[in-house]
């Protein structure tokens, strides 16, 4: 019986609970979250977000791991996630600016700016701490790398971890997913007057055009991945002094690896560097990364999550998150439809 308690609840030993305890907690949280992620509620699937919820549930019942290890695994998962994204988008990243991508990126910047303005307005009107409202914004727009970058910046400045940032993210994230989906439905019905069947047919045609091709090679090339991660961490740790900002700015463990992965995947072949990674290997790295990150965010936020939601300002945070989710999406949808004349599928891609 003591063995079972030690494995699940931890015991005095290496890394505050033992290696087996750590691996069991992380593995079960990810496994349960992934199983639940395959289910749909009212036709809506939360996917990998369930990993976050299961992590919160575990931490609420005291099934957690050492906080220093949580911090490490969270950052490592974030690096894997953003680096795999950079490898995927890098080859066509720069060419997209020459084929209408500049307009789409301009709309994306507009949407982000509106979200930031709404967030700043909420901060000053409600006196919510900056750390909390930053977490709410990250969850409301489902911006996982943004949360990681904000947490690292705060840690670099203060030397402390902001648990309320993770709690704000966890509270706002579910409604961020639902609000985004409902906003897309509203845009489809009101602005485009497209039926559900027509939109599904258009998406199917887009998939056929894109091909969703598999790579011919079965051997994943890990060399550029880990060299790029090392270079990205170095780049993200370089302090950059900007006028008007007292604290040097860093790209962090989200920005550095992302930039390096885009550059390596785009320009690596010119220098005879084999940067190709099979789609399956890239997807595996990305899914492991996001699963580790959300697991650790859940374990980090779960200890005070229920108390904040029930007895604290959790319901207000949900309302603020809904505003941050809906207002930028609807504003971007209006501009995209009536100013830029974008079709529905292109617009939803930008809004996502």
Q: Model segments located where?
A:
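Transmembrane helix-loop junctions at the membrane interface of multipass transporters and ion channels
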Residues: 64-68, 92-93, 125-127, 145-167, ...
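Alpha-helical membrane segments and immediately flanking helix-loop junctions
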Residues: 126-174, 335, 339-352
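Juxtamembrane and boundary regions of transmembrane helices in multi-pass small-molecule transporters
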Residues: 2, 6, 115-130, 168-211, ...
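Entry/N-cap segments of selected transmembrane alpha helices
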Residues: 93-119, 173, 283-284, 289, ...
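Membrane-interface segments at loop-to-transmembrane junctions
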Residues: 42-46, 69-73, 96-110, 133-139, ...
């Amino acid at each position: 019986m003591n063995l079972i308690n030690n494995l699940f609840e931890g015991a005095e030993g290496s890394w505050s609970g033992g290696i087996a305890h750590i691996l069991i907690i992380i593995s079960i949280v990810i496994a349960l979250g992934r199983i639940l992620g395959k289910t749909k509620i009212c036709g809506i699937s939360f996917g990998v977000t369930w990993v976050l919820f299961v992590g919160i549930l575990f931490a609420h019942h005291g099934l957690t791991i050492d906080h220093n290890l949580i911090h490490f695994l969270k950052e490592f998962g974030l690096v894997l996630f953003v680096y795999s994204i950079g490898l995927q988008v890098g080859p066509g990243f720069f060419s997209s600016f020459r084929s209408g991508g500049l307009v789409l990126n301009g709309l994306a910047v507009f949407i982000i700016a509106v979200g930031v303005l709404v967030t700043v307005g909420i901060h000053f009107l409600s006196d919510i701490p900056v750390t909390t409202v930053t977490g709410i914004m990250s969850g409301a727009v489902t911006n996982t790398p943004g949360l990681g970058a904000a947490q690292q910046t705060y840690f670099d400045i203060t030397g402390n971890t902001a648990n309320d940032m993770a709690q704000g993210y966890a509270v706002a994230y579910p409604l961020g997913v639902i609000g985004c989906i409902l906003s897309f439905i509203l845009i489809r019905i009101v602005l485009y007057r497209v039926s559900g069947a027509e939109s599904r047919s258009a998406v199917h045609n887009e998939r056929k055009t894109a091909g969703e091709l598999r790579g011919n090679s079965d051997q994943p090339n890990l060399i550029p991945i880990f060299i790029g991660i090392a270079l990205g961490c170095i780049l993200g740790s370089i302090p950059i002094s900007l006028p008007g900002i007292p604290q040097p700015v860093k790209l962090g463990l989200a920005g550095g690896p992302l930039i390096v992965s885009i550059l390596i995947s785009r320009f690596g072949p010119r220098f005879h560097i084999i940067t190709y990674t099979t789609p399956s290997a890239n997807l595996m790295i990305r899914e492991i990364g996001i699963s580790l990150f959300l697991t650790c965010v859940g374990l980090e936020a779960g200890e005070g999550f229920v108390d904040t939601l029930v007895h604290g300002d959790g319901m207000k945070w949900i309302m603020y998150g809904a505003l941050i989710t809906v207002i930028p999406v609807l504003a971007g949808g209006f501009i995209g439809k009536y100013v830029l004349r974008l079709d529905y599928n292109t617009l939803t891609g930008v809004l996502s």
